[in-house]
Design a protein with these regions (language model features):
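The conserved catalytic core of RNA pseudouridine synthases
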Residues: 111-139, 172-228, 250-251
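RNA pseudouridine synthases
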Residues: 1-176, 201
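A short, terminal or domain-edge coil/loop segment
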Residues: 93-99, 166-178, 206, 210-214, ...
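Short edge beta-strand segments in beta-sheet-rich domains
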Residues: 146-150, 165, 191, 245, ...
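Pseudouridine synthases involved in rRNA/tRNA modification
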Residues: 1-33, 186-190, 203-206, 214-251
Length: 251
């Protein structure tokens, strides 16, 4: 059973939509079956999927659910954990997010602090510090490029060479929660550097590539790849309809 007080300030929305946003990895079938059994309640009263909920309401969902943290490494100072694809790191812009990587981290160790992040639809390994000294040292290591983040993804080809590097600028559109690659600075655009290497041709003009976001801006890899005509398979924000079947993963 899941019992949850919706944070104040969360706007009104249908219960089913809120549940999908609050627990994004909860199987859709479990949510559908709970509503069919009338096992979803708002403030003690049974509700239907279209009934609305808002900040301050208490939501109860009778499902079997667990939210484990996949820990790869823990020496008491540093954690390496796996962020599943589809799990956001933190709550969204409306404050919705009962199950996030941060909530799982805090359940595992109350002092855990992430050293870097991944987009919600990207799965991979993240590092977290368990003490202040490790946290500051880790931030410095990323800032000074002593640690490299490498991604593997399937992207549309063909590529002009086996390896390459792109240097451009990235402009944010906060209202649409997107970014745009531009060739020149100005308007708040920040420099970006992306290195890429073709690992394998998979057929039908798809390639397995290794990507390194040297500058590590928000959505940098997805936007940069799409800008040069190599959208990542599964990218539902910057890719085309044909690319929305899988997701990228950080190794």
């Amino acid at each position: 059973m899941l019992t949850h007080r919706i944070p104040r300030g969360v706007p009104e929305m249908p219960a089913r939509r809120y549940i999908r946003r609050a627990w994004p990895l909860l199987p859709e079938r479990d949510v559908r079956d709970a509503f069919a059994r009338r096992d979803v309640k708002k403030n003690g009263a049974r509700i239907a999927p279209a009934d609305t909920v808002r900040g301050g309401d208490e939501l109860t969902l009778y499902v079997n659910a667990s939210f484990p943290l996949d820990v790869l490494f823990d020496d008491g100072h540093l954690l390496a954990v796996v962020k599943p694809q589809g799990l956001p790191v933190d709550v969204d812009q409306d404050g919705v997010g009962e199950d996030t990587l941060l909530s799982r981290l805090r359940a595992y160790h109350e002092n855990a602090r992430l050293l870097h992040r991944l987009d919600a639809q990207t799965g991979g390994v993240l590092l977290a510090a368990l003490e202040e000294k490790t946290y500051q040292n880790g931030l410095a290591a990323f800032r000074e490029h002593q640690l490299a983040k490498t991604y593997r993804a399937v992207a549309k080809g063909p590529f002009p060479a086996a390896t390459g590097e792109w240097r451009d600028y990235l402009s944010k559109d906060a209202r649409r929660a997107t970014v745009r690659v531009v060739k020149h600075p100005g308007g708040g655009a920040k420099p970006i550097i992306t290195r890429w290497r073709v690992l394998e041709e998979l057929g039908e003009n798809w390639f397995l590539v290794e990507l390194e976001p040297v500058t590590g801006r928000t959505h940098q890899l997805r936007a940069h790849m799409a800008f040069y005509g190599h959208p990542i398979l599964g990218d539902d924000k910057y890719g085309s309809r044909e690319t929305r079947a899988a997701r990228l993963h950080l190794w």
